[in-house]
C-alpha cells in the first residue's frame, strides 16, 4: 500500500508541467540549502556566544576576586562593604548578578539579602580547595543561569573565598535573538529571491522549449528524424557559422558521403560540400529553385532560414539531382509542346475546314484543290527547313510549335535566314537549350500582345557558326522599364508583377543556365520599339568563373 501511494505521488508529479516541476525542484533544493546554512550559522553563533559569555564571566569574576577591597571585606566578613562594592560593580557591568562566599562557600553577599549565610549552589566538589576556576550552568536561586566561579586568594596565596558571576539564560537568549532574528530575515529574503529566480528560470526554460514538454520535444525530434529519412530530396541543416546540424540519408547518398550521418554533425560544411557558397553566404535569405553544383553533382536547390523571433538559428537546404528534374521537365515539355501543337493545328484545321466547306458549297472546286495543295506544301516546307537547319530535333520541334502558336495569337514569328544549329553548347542538354529559346519567345509573344504599337512581328536568330552559340530574339512590344533592367533576371521580378499568376521565373531560369555555361546576356531597345535579347554561349566552356554573365 505504501509503495502504491508513492507511485501515485510520483505520477502526480510527472503530470505537472515541466517548468513547474523545475520550479518545485529548485524551490525544495533552495529550502534545503537555506535550512542547512541556517543550521550551520545558528550552531556557529551558539558556540561563539557560549564561549564569549564564559570568557566574559570568568574575566569579570577574576577581576572582582583580585580586588583588594573585596579581599579585605571577605577576610573581615564585612557584609555591608561587600554589598556596597557588589552593587557598584553590577551597575557598571553587564552581568546579571554576583555572589560572594567564604572559603566554605557560605554566601557573604547575594542580591537577595535573605540568601546570605546559606551555602552557595552548584559548587564543584574539591575545586575551591584546589584553587580551580570553573563554569557551571543550572537553575539556581536567581533562575537558570550560566555561572563562572573563581577563588579569592589572600596575600599568602590561601583561598579565603569565592566569586560567582552569573548570566541569566533569558538574557543570553535575548542576545541570541538579536542576532538570529535579522539573520532569519536575511534567509527569508534570500529564499524569496531564490524563488523568484527559480520562477524566472522555469519561465525561461519554457520559452526556450517553445512551451513544449520534454516528451513532446522528444517526439518532435523523432518525427524530424523520420521526416529527414523519408524525404526523397537531400536535406542539410547548418547553423549561422556554417556547421552541419543535420543531414539525411539521401543527401549523403547524392553527395557521395559514405559515413553515417552522426559523424558529419558539427563539421564545417566547407569540408563536406564544394563549393559551399549556397550554404554559407546570405543564409538569411530565402532561395528557390537555384541551379547549383554540389560535389560535382548538378542540383536544383532551395534554402529556407531557420529563425527564433529575430534570431537567426541557421538554414535548411533541400536539393534534388538536376538530371532527375531535367528528365521530368523534358517529358513535361514534350507533352506540353505536343498538346499546344495539337491545339493550334486543331484551331487552324477548323478554320481551314470551314473555308473549305464554304468553297465546296459554292462549287469552287479549282480553288479547293489549290488551297489543299498550298496548305500541305507550306507546312511541309516549314518542317523540312527546320529539320535541315537544326540538328537537335527537340529544338526543331519547339520552333515549329512556336511558329504555329504565334500564328494563332495573331502574331508573326520569323526565323531569320541563316539561322542554324549543328550542335548544342557544352553544359546544356536539349531540354535546357529549348527552355532558353522557348522562354525568350514566350516573353516576346506576351510583350507584343501587351503593346498597341509595333508590327506584331517576333524575330529569332539562332546560329553556332562562330566561336559562340548566338541566340537573338527581337520584338516590337512594350519593352522593359528602366527601373527593372538591373534586376529583370532575378527570381520573382517581372514586368507583369501586377497581374495574377506566377511570374518572374522564365528569365531567372535563362540566366541560371547561361551563367553556368559562362555565357553573356545583353538587353537592348529594339527599333522602333520593343526589346532585343541577345545571348552568347561559348562553344568551349571557360575556366574563368568570374565572367559576368549578364550585361545590361
Swiss-Prot record:
Side of membrane Periplasmic, spans: 43-182
Enumerate the subcellular locations listed in this protein's record, separating them with semicolons.
Answer: Cell inner membrane
Q: How is its activity regulated?
A: Autophosphorylation is induced in vitro by dithiothreitol (DTT).
Asked if the keyword Cell inner membrane belongs to this entry, the reply reads: yes
Taken from the UniProt record, the cysteine pairs bridged by disulfide bonds within this chain are: none
Q: Which residues form the PAS domain?
A: 222-292
| Residue ranges, Cytoplasmic side | 1-21, 204-552
Q: Tell me what topology the record assigns in the membrane.
A: Multi-pass membrane protein
Per its record, the protein catalyses: ATP + protein L-histidine = ADP + protein N-phospho-L-histidine
Q: What is its EC number?
A: 2.7.13.3
What domain of life?
Bacteria
Instruction: List GO terms (cellular component aspect).
Output: cytosol; outer membrane-bounded periplasmic space; plasma membrane
According to the entry, every stretch annotated as the Histidine kinase domain falls at 344-541
Keyword list (alphabetical) reads: ATP-binding, Cell inner membrane, Cell membrane, Kinase, Membrane, Nucleotide-binding, Phosphoprotein, Transferase, Transmembrane, Transmembrane helix, Two-component regulatory system
Write out the GO MF terms.
ATP binding; histidine phosphotransfer kinase activity; phosphorelay sensor kinase activity; protein histidine kinase activity
Supply the InterPro entries for this chain: HATPase_C_sf (IPR036890), His_kinase_dom (IPR005467), PAS (IPR000014), PAS-like_dom_sf (IPR035965), PAS_fold (IPR013767), sCache_3 (IPR033463), Sensor-like_sf (IPR029151), Sig_transdc_His_kin-like_C (IPR004358)
A Pfam entry, by short name: HATPase_c
Transmembrane region(s): 22-42, 183-203
Q: Which residues carry this modification: Phosphohistidine?
A: 347
Q: List, in alphabetical order, the GO biological process terms annotated in this UniProt record.
A: phosphorelay signal transduction system; regulation of DNA-templated transcription
| PTM entry text | Autophosphorylated.
Q: What is known of its domains?
A: The periplasmic domain binds citrate with high affinity. The C-terminal cytoplasmic domain senses reduced conditions using a single Cys in vitro.
Role noted for this protein: Member of the two-component regulatory system DpiA/DpiB, which is essential for expression of citrate-specific fermentation genes and genes involved in plasmid inheritance. Could be involved in response to both the presence of citrate and external redox conditions. Functions as a sensor kinase that phosphorylates DpiA in the presence of citrate.
Q: What is this protein called?
A: Sensor histidine kinase DpiB
Instruction: Give the species this sequence originates from.
Output: Escherichia coli (strain K12)
The organism's lineage is: Bacteria, Pseudomonadati, Pseudomonadota, Gammaproteobacteria, Enterobacterales
